[in-house]
Each structure stands twice: as C-alpha cells, then as structure tokens.
Amino acid sequence: MSSSVAEANHTEKEESLRLAIAVSLLRSKFQNHQSSSSTSRCYVSSESDALRWKQKAKERKKEIIRLQEDLKDAESSFHRDLFPANASCKCYFFDNLGVFSGRRIGEASESRFNDVLRRRFLRLARRRSRRKLTRSSQRLQPSEPDYEEEAEHLRISIDFLLELSEADSNDSNFSNWSHQAVDFIFASLKKLISMGRNLESVEESISFMITQLITRMCTPVKGNEVKQLETSVGFYVQHLIRKLGSEPFIGQRAIFAISQRISILAENLLFMDPFDESFPEMDECMFILIQLIEFLICDYLLPWANEAFDNVMFEEWIASVVHARKAVKALEERNGLYLLYMDRVTGELAKRVGQITSFREVEPAILDKILAYQEIE
C-alpha cells in the first residue's frame, strides 16, 4: 500500500517536472521569437536610416565640390590682381592698372557682384566700426532714420576702405575687400545725394577719404615693410582713387585735392636738395599725381557732363589745375618732364571742355584760362 502511494507521488512529481520543463521551453521559445522579430525590425530601421544619411552625405559632398569649383573659377579669373593667389571675386577691379581705357571705368564690374562677399563685407565693416565708435556718439535721429542709416553706412565703408589701404593692412584683405568698400560707398553716396539733406557732412566725409588716400598713395614704403609686388603700392592706391572717381561727386573733389597737392609738392621740390634721401619718393609722387589727374579727366569728364554736374565745383578744380600748372612751371629748369606732363593734362582738359556745350554756363574767365591750353598737347 505504502509502496503504491510512493510510486504515485513519484509519478506526480515527474509529471510536474515535465510540465514545468515544457512551460519553460515554450516561454523560452516565445521570448526568442519575440527578440528575433524585434532585432529584425531594428535592423531594417537602422539600415533605412543609414541609407538616408548616406544619401545626404553624398549630396553634401557634391555641394562642397561644386562650391570648391566655383571658388577656383573665381580665383583663376582674377588674372592681374594685386595678390592673384588670394583673389576671391570676378570684379577685375585691378585690371588695366595704370593704363588708359577706351571705355568708362566700372562697366566691367557691373552685374558681377558676389552677394556672399557683400554680406560678409558689411558684417566685417560694421564689426570693426563698433570697436571704434560708441553708440552714444552715433544716436539716430527719429526724424531722419533713413538718412542717418545711409550716412552711417557711408562712414563705415570709408573707414573700412582707409583701414584696408594702410601700410600694415593684410594683403589678401586689400585685394578681396577694396572693391566691395567702393561699391558700398557708391550706393550710400547716391542715396544720400538723392535725399538732398546735409550734403556738407557728406562732402566732408568724401574729402577726408580722398585726402587720406592721396597721403597713402604718396607715402613711401619703409624698407622693412616692402612687399613683393611688381608695381609700387602707390599705383594700386592710385587705381583705387581712379575707380572712386567714376562718381562725379567724388571725382571732381579728387581732382581738386590732387591739383592742390601738386602745387604744394612743386613748391617743396623747388627748395629741396636733389640729393636728399626723400627726393626720389617725392619725384615719383609727382608723376603719380599728374597721371591720376589725366586718368580722371580722360576717363570721366565727358560722362560727368551727361549727369548732374556741379558747375561750382568744376570752376574750383579748373582754377586749381591751372594754378598747379603754374607751380610746376617753376620746376622747368630742374625737371622739364613735370611741365610737359602738366601741359598734356591741360591740353586734354581743354579739348574736352570745348566739346561740351553745357560748360558754357561756367564763368567765362575760368573757361578762358583752360581753353588757352587747347593747342598744347
């Protein structure tokens, strides 16, 4: 009896054990199946994400390659820039350096603006301006917000251009940003002139810019600052003024300032020892100044006459050029080339003045002075 009970208990335990093992196997099998399906879904999702990011990476790489090609094209197009390896736009700003052009300066650069460079220039110029000026001195007047904003843009662009033209300025910055500053100066100046308010302040800013650029053009480079250039730095600043002179408001004042500088320089050379160390630099400066006046007159005088022309300013710089010619005449015994070049300038001026009927409104005495040189070339 007892043995049969023991066998029954043993059999019951074996069945319970088998049932437990079966349940465990089923549970394990179910968990393995669930895990494998989850892994499969994760794998498919991960593979899809990988393909998507791989496609994006390919698109980004193509975009980078395209931008690099555009940059190479931009650099290669700047054939005769001041620093060809660092050129970054297609404006041809320093083409025809020191060469007479048969067209109006500025046409080659029209519709070649690089929007990215323009935005970068404005940000950089404003950032540098904030370092120099306090907001307390630059408060905007609520009654004239547009005028003050454009006036501020003009001041910022002028300050930035003058900073670029300094002797210790970075070479690549000068070649990359100088034409951007010129473009912004033109845009702001035209808007300010069209507003017709407070032009005295605008004229003061422009005159200051011209004076500083002329000083930089005639400042000799120190021995330890000589840059590896094929042409004197003064000729690049000369070309910069020549570009700025395409705008009548700037060009006429540039001729006036340059002719005055020629008169002062001629007086200094008259009493200077020709063996003085600074004589060669002053001699070179004289030729650069005379050449610059000739460029401005030959390039722009006729186009200026077709625009809003300031006859009062015209009379002033005509008289100043005549006075400069007289000052140079005193140097004829020292260097007759000065007078020959100035006679050529006055001759070109007289020929162009004679072609423009609108100049008949100018004071006759002023015209008589310049027309007297019409036969001199």
UniProtKB/Swiss-Prot annotation:
GO cellular component, one term: cytoplasm
Compartment list: Nucleus; Cytoplasm, Cytoskeleton, Spindle
Span of the annotated motif Nuclear localization signal: 117-124
Keywords, comma-separated and alphabetical: Cytoplasm, Cytoskeleton, Developmental protein, DNA recombination, Meiosis, Nucleus
Disruption phenotype: Defective in early recombination processes leading to the absence of meiotic DNA double-strand break (DSB) formation. Reduced silique elongation associated with fertility defects involving both male and female gametophyte abortion due to aberrant meiotic products. Produced multiple uneven spores aborted in later stages during anther development, due to abnormal chromosome segregation and unequal bipolar or multipolar spindles in meiocytes.
Primary location class: nucleus
Alphabetical list of InterPro entries matching this protein: Msp1
GO-annotated biological processes: chiasma assembly; chromosome segregation; embryo sac development; male meiotic nuclear division; meiotic DNA double-strand break formation; meiotic spindle organization; plant-type sporogenesis; pollen development
Tissue expression summary: Expressed in roots, stems, leaves, inflorescences and seedlings. Strongly expressed in meiocytes.
Known role: Involved in meiotic spindle organization in meiocytes thus regulating chromosome segregation. Required for formation of meiotic DNA double-strand breaks (DSBs) during early recombination processes.
UniProt protein name: Protein MULTIPOLAR SPINDLE 1
Gene that produces this protein: MPS1
